[in-house]
């Protein structure tokens, strides 16, 4: 008692000191759990918390913000006031953010890796267009706060990060379409190294502070939650260089990936249906020209060109199915039908045309025929592989290359004029193939909301339809009015006349070896036809015979077209 009085501390004083110690300990722990609320805020933090609504705090449930976000960006001050990166001159544009959030051992904190892609950033003179920046940071879900940074001077292989982050169908299909229709990975990497944003990542500390909110339930589709992020992107320079660019306002909403699943599945259903129609059209055409003479009238180049196109489509759909594993079944089905069209029907018809054009009385053995057949296959697959290399090297000119590939009716038009062929193709085959071949390119380059996210090009689509329609019209004119109906007579070669005059000094009659009935040669009428080898037949009999074989029924010599 004396000692306590000597210290000057009573029981009441000791109680106050004890409660103060407990309060300080609890407040320090609370301060550690609330680093964002209690630390000194920048003007961007004040803006961010000023826009936060009370209703957004709600119950403290962990939100999984992993996914793809698409939205817009714009400068707060309308223009970039910084002079360090003057190429950053656009006022606004589109942006895509890809985030992967992983829970940590710290309660309420998720570790986040991400990629932000800014479209329409630089002038067209840069030939870059957009900027891609790799980010990492934390998401503090009790306060719906997202903090991301991209440190300057950080050299890393972005390819491995892209493989880990950009793994959903939305981005994978975009990568696939950009590689096929727009640019190669080599050019994309070269542009990234030469891009001003590469220097930006080296000399700037990029910081993003965003507020995450849940999209209203009326805007949701299904049970999946969708989120909206709104925040600021600042880029203070390293040292005393000043800001790299003015603050950016980011707005992005999570993308409904199921929509892209459905679009991709609907596309594969369309390709499957189109392939089935092409099989029916090929069967109809093969029945139309099921004779040796009918098959010989068809251009082997025309069928081979279509077979190569279907082989390319088969490989493309199979590659897309392997790239996007969740859509493998849908794309593999489309690839299978294209494989059936290419390998079973078109290659079979190609061989029938090749056999019909070979002379049947050449007397060559099986070894010679097998050698010629091997040469045919070698040329076909050589052109197939060579075309892949050419398209890879000239991928920037994909649309002109497609126009060249869709000129497959031209070899048949030229063959009709040269051979004076008579109705080689069925009209249904001409119209059906023209329409079904246009389905895929019109979807890719004409549909504004295609799943590949290729920018529509209406002018090119109109040119393609006009080009294909003109070819089909010429083939139909040749079918109904003759193969050389549009060629001036002065340019036509001399044509053999089967109704030519013959020597009637000796009055005689002869038999038609086709129908075995007599032919009266004393009167020159259109009912009688004479071959270059001086054999006589009824007009109807010889025309039906030439539809099967272009050989004289009597002496087996080849006959000129009628």
Curated annotation (Swiss-Prot):
Q: Which residues lie on this side of the membrane: Cytoplasmic?
A: 284-297, 343-373, 419-426, 480-562
Tissues with expression: Highly expressed in stems. Expressed in root xylem and seed coat.
Q: Where is the signal peptide?
A: 1-32
Q: Name one GO cellular component term.
A: endomembrane system
What Pfam families does its record include? DUF2921 (PF11145), zf-RING_2 (PF13639)
The EC number(s) attached to this protein equal 2.3.2.27
* Protein location: Endomembrane system
The GO biological-process annotations, alphabetized, read as:
mucilage extrusion from seed coat; mucilage pectin metabolic process; plant-type cell wall modification; protein ubiquitination
Residues in compartment: Lumenal: 33-262, 319-321, 395-397, 448-458
Q: Zinc fingers (RING-type) span which residues?
A: 512-556
Q: Where are the transmembrane segments?
A: 263-283, 298-318, 322-342, 374-394, 398-418, 427-447, 459-479
Report the GO molecular function annotations.
ubiquitin-protein transferase activity; zinc ion binding
Which comment does the entry carry about domains? Answer: The RING-type zinc finger domain is required for E3 ligase activity.
Name of the protein in its database record: Transmembrane E3 ubiquitin-protein ligase FLY1
Q: Which organism is it from?
A: Arabidopsis thaliana (Mouse-ear cress)
Q: Its gene?
A: FLY1
């Amino acid at each position: 008692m004396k000692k306590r009085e000597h210290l000057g501390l009573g029981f009441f004083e000791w109680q106050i000191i004890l409660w103060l110690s407990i309060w300080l300990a609890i407040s320090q722990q609370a301060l550690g759990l609330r680093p964002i609320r209690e630390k000194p805020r920048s003007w961007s933090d004040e803006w961010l918390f000023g826009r936060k609504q009370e209703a957004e705090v709600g119950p403290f449930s962990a939100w999984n913000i992993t996914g793809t976000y698409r939205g817009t960006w714009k400068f707060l001050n309308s223009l970039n006031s910084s002079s360090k990166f003057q190429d950053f001159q656009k006022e606004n544009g589109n942006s895509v953010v890809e985030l992967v959030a992983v829970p940590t051992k710290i309660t309420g904190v998720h570790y986040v890796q991400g990629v932000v892609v800014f479209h329409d950033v630089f002038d067209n003179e840069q030939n870059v267009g957009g900027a891609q920046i790799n980010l990492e940071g934390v998401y503090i879900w009790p306060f719906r706060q997202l903090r991301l940074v991209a440190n300057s001077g950080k050299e890393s292989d972005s390819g491995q990060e892209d493989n880990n982050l950009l793994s959903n169908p939305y981005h994978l299909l975009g990568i696939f379409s950009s590689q096929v229709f727009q640019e190669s990975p080599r050019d994309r990497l070269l542009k990234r190294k030469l891009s001003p944003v590469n220097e930006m990542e080296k000399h700037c500390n990029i910081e993003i502070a965003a507020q995450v909110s849940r999209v209203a339930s009326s805007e949701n589709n299904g049970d999946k939650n969708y989120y909206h992020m709104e925040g600021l992107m600042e880029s203070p320079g390293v040292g005393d260089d000043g800001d790299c660019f003015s603050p950016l306002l980011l707005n992005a909403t999570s993308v409904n990936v199921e929509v892209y699943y459905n679009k991709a599945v609907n596309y594969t259903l369309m390709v499957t249906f189109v392939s089935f129609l092409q099989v029916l059209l090929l069967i109809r055409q093969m029945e139309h020209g099921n004779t040796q003479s009918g098959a010989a009238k068809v251009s082997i180049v025309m069928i081979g060109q279509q077979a190569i196109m279907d082989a390319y489509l088969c490989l493309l759909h199979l590659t897309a199915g392997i790239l996007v594993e969740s859509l493998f079944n849908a794309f593999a089905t489309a690839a299978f039908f294209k494989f059936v069209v290419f390998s079973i029907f078109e290659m079979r018809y190609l061989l029938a045309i090749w056999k019909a054009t070979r002379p049947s009385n050449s007397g060559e053995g099986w070894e010679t025929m097998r050698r010629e057949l091997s040469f045919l296959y070698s040329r076909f697959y050589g052109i197939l592989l060579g075309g892949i290399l050419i398209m890879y090297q000239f991928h920037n000119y994909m649309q002109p290359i497609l126009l060249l590939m869709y000129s497959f009716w031209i070899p048949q038009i030229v063959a009709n004029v040269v051979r004076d062929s008579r109705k080689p193709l069925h009209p249904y085959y001409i119209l059906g193939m023209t329409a079904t071949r246009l389905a895929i390119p019109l979807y890719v380059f004409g549909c504004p909301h295609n799943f590949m996210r290729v920018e529509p090009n209406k002018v090119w689509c109109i040119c393609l339809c006009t080009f294909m329609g003109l070819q089909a019209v010429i083939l139909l004119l040749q079918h109904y009015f003759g193969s050389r109906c549009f060629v001036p007579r002065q340019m036509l070669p001399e044509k053999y006349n089967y109704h030519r005059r013959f020597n009637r000094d000796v009055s005689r009659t002869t038999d038609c070896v086709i129908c075995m009935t007599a032919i009266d040669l004393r009167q020159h009428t259109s009912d009688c036809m004479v071959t270059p080898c001086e054999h006589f037949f009824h007009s109807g009999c010889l025309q039906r015979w030439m539809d099967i074989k272009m050989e004289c029924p009597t002496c087996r010599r080849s006959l000129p077209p009628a």
